[in-house]
Amino acid sequence: MDAPERYEQLIAFLESNLPPPVDRQETPDGSVQFISGEPAEVVVSLTETSVLVSEFSGVWESQFTFAARPRRVGVLKWRRLQETALFNALAVLIKGAREMRLSRFQVCRYCGRSTAPEWMHDDGVCQACADQHSGAIH
């Protein structure tokens, strides 16, 4: 199988194996970035030679500016691996990144929802409940 066909297979594999919804974006450097899950859980960057799998993460740079800072889980040189080995390894990396991300969620003591860490106001209180229960001002 030639490289362009394999590249398209990788795209199809990612779109069907990442947690939905999957947002696919072409980047200026020619790579394809996939951000999956709601809220975001896994970030995958696909280049002409490698697949980088990361756990979604980020920081609030200001009160209104959130900057994504994915945490790398693993990189695969997809041209060097046989198809079965590549897809098996990629599935494990995606599963690991998702599990790492979900393990950081916290349950809000007011509403009981499992909430991404960037949307927690304090330990145990999500931002939405903090606005309602404590009069937080933004």
Regions found by a protein language model. Give the residues of each.
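Long, charged N-terminal interaction/targeting segments
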Residues: 1-89
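Cys/His-clustered metal-coordination modules, chiefly Zn-binding fingers
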Residues: 75-138
